[in-house]
Swiss-Prot record:
The lineage of its organism: Eukaryota, Viridiplantae, Streptophyta, Embryophyta, Tracheophyta. Pfam families: LRR_1, LRR_8. Gene3D superfamilies: Ribonuclease Inhibitor. It comes from the Eukaryota. Widely expressed but at low levels. GO terms for biological process: intracellular signal transduction. This is Plant intracellular Ras-group-related LRR protein 6. The keyword Zinc does not apply. Keywords: Leucine-rich repeat, Repeat. Disruption phenotype: No visible phenotype. SUPFAM superfamilies: L domain-like. Leucine-rich repeat protein that likely mediates protein interactions, possibly in the context of signal transduction. LRR repeats lie at residues 44-67, 68-90, 92-114, 116-136, 137-159, 160-182, 184-206, 207-229, 231-252, 253-275, 277-297, 299-320, 359-382, 383-405, 406-428, 430-452, 454-476, 477-500, 501-523, 524-547, 549-570. Belongs to the SHOC2 family.
Length: 586
């Protein structure tokens, strides 16, 4: 023990886990001061990290306040039933792990530990969370799963920096709109295994939400506002009381996993067939058939349908390979179309007119895939359109009339034949926050070309190798949050990207990168980094400093030699932890 304490006096970090301790050594409460004659006090370091996990501790004394420099405290997996008020006298405490104890209440003094960033109080006996926790304005991760909490204090809405919240396995009946409207930074939320009966309409405010797990509740309805959760990639709603799902769910363009098993669904809406899912679980519902349009979901790899009273599908299709079922549905779709009336096909003018009518209420004009060679006048005839989709056409130039669309926030020009940067038009679109120009034969983009788009938050230039912006160009986009540069024939990581402090998603896949700069650590807002299909052989340890914000790191298709494949298969968290541990000790 003396050797461990001596080492801790030098490093400021003490790990006494798995030692069958029944009480905390008194030297710990004395900030490692043993009073030994040969100690040189000036060589000592205040205790900053204390790990007492997996022991038999029953009490944490008020003397804890002596450890005023403590940043990390882990007392998980003990027999502690209460926390001392002194927890509030730790002004530097950022991480508190009290999980797997017998704690039945937090002291109100927890609210004075205002530096707290991460709190794990899972697997305890808590019936509520203290109102004072709302004073911890830096709180970004809260795990209160597997307790008996029945209500959350409204004041928690003040913790606006929360990005990961786990409330699984409690007794929550409701979640308030006020909280959802405030927690706009949330990327991951788990409220599974509760008693929830509804999802608040305010869910739409969570535009950064990537994973939402609400399985095993008593929810009867998914609100249409779910369509505004534009980043949602995984949505788990199994074991609820749903009888239908909204058509608008089809607008979730990033959704890859949708779990709706064990509900009371009687139909799967045609609108939801627009989703680009890889996994869809509809098992144990009341479905008697499926829309033929579901066959167009070519991204679907797994579709589960067992436990439904299917009357329009053979059992061999229901239980067979997903690809066979999709092929059958597609064939039914084509035969249905052939048998529906006169066989006349709507003209382009009809399609444009219909799209314009829809845009009057939605403010979104979809003119994609019409095969037009120029922008139809419908695009600028109403100047209040906020989203314009002109993708998958053969457009070569943007007309100056498009400058009239002063309300335009999203402009999608993917998969066209645009060669020249439409600077005149873009300079008039002051509200533009999303621009997709991927897969166009664009010429070089100058730094001055991007100056007019200073409010841009999302930019996609993928597949346009000759249009790689000048090195200083992206620095003109200080608000950029998402940048997609797939298939750009990049041979080096653009240093100018390292100054984009708000960047949350960076896609550099399918290039020729051989390395990643140490400066990647400066992109502290990143939640997704795609480096797949490059020539990267090693990763800098500094990449590990992006944990825990970075949630998705894609590395497939690289000849990585410095990281074992077994580690790569364990996913982002394991990789970042490994890299972080390789950093030299300070």
């Amino acid at each position: 023990m003396e050797r461990v304490l001596k080492s801790a006096r030098e490093s400021g970090s003490l790990n006494l886990s798995n030692r069958s301790l029944r009480e905390v050594p008194k030297e710990v409460y004395n900030n490692l001061d043993t009073g030994a004659q040969d100690e040189k006090w000036w060589e000592g370091v205040d205790l900053q990290k204390l790990i007492l996990a997996h022991n038999n501790l029953e009490v944490l004394r008020e003397d804890l306040r002596n450890l005023s420099s403590l940043v990390v405290l882990n007392i998980s997996h003990n027999n502690i039933s209460s926390l001392p008020a002194a927890i509030g006298d730790l002004p530097l405490l950022k991480s508190l792990d009290v999980s797997s104890n017998q704690i039945n209440a937090f002291p109100e003094e927890i609210g004075f530990a205002t530096a707290l960033v991460k709190v794990d109080c899972s697997n305890n006996c808590l019936t509520d969370l203290p109102v004072s926790l709302a004073r911890c304005l830096e709180l970004s991760e809260l795990n209160a799963s597997n307790n008996t909490i029945s209500v959350l204090p409204d004041e928690l809405a003040g913790c606006s920096k929360l990005f990961r919240l786990n409330l699984e396995g409690n007794k929550l009946v409701t979640l308030s709109d006020k909280m959802f409207m405030s927690w706009t930074m949330l990327t991951e939320m788990n409220a599974a295994k509760n008693l929830l009966t509804a999802i608040p309409d305010g869910i739409g405010a969570l535009s950064k939400l990537i994973r939402l797990d609400l399985h095993q509740n008593k929810i009867t309805l998914i609100p249409p506002s779910i369509k505004d959760c534009s980043s949602l990639a995984e949505f788990y709603m199994g074991n609820n009381l749903l009888t239908s799902i909204p058509e608008d769910i089809g607008m979730l363009s990033n959704l890859g996993i949708l779990d709706l098993h064990s509900n009371q669904l009687k139909e799967y809406p045609v609108g939801a067939c627009r989703l680009k899912l890889s996994f869809l679980d509809l098992s144990n519902n009341s479905l008697s058939g499926l829309p033929a349009e579901l066959g167009t979901m070519t991204t679907l790899r797994k579709l589960l349908l067992t436990g439904n009273p299917m009357r329009t599908l053979r059992s061999s299709l229901v239980s067979g390979p997903t690809t066979a079922l999709l092929k059958y549905l597609r064939s039914r779709l084509s035969s249905d179309e052939g048998a529906s009336g006169s066989g006349s096909t709507p003209t382009k003018d009809d399609q444009i007119a219909a799209a314009r009518r829809l845009s009057l209420s939605s403010k979104e004009l979809d003119l994609s895939g019409l095969g037009v060679t120029s922008v139809p006048p419908a695009a600028w005839e109403t100047n209040d359109v906020m989203k314009l989709d002109l993708s998958k056409n053969s457009i070569e130039d943007l007309p100056n009339e498009l400058s009239l669309c002063s309300s335009l926030q999203s402009l999608i020009l993917s998969n066209n034949k645009i060669k020249r940067w439409p600077g005149t038009v873009f300079s008039s679109l002051a509200s533009l926050s999303l621009l997709k120009l991927d897969n166009n034969p664009l010429a070089e983009i100058l730094a001055t070309d991007l100056e007019a788009l200073s409010k841009l938050e999302v930019l996609d230039l993928s597949g346009s190798a000759s249009s790689l912006p000048e090195p200083s160009a992206v620095s003109k986009l200080p608000h950029l949050k998402e940048l997609y540069l797939r298939r750009m024939k990049l041979h080096g990581f653009p240093d100018s990207l390292l100054g984009l402090k708000l960047l949350r998603i960076l896609d550099l896949s399918q290039n020729y990168l051989t390395s990643v700069p140490e400066g990647i650590k400066d992109l502290t807002s990143l939640i997704e980094l795609d480096l797949s299909d490059n020539n990267i052989t090693t990763l800098p340890p500094e990449l590990g400093l992006l944990e825990p914000n970075l949630q998705v790191l894609k590395l497939d298709g690289n000849p990585l030699r410095s990281i074992r494949r077994t580690l790569l298969e364990r996913g982002t968290k394991a990789i970042l932890k490994y890299l972080k541990e390789k950093l030299p000790a300070e």
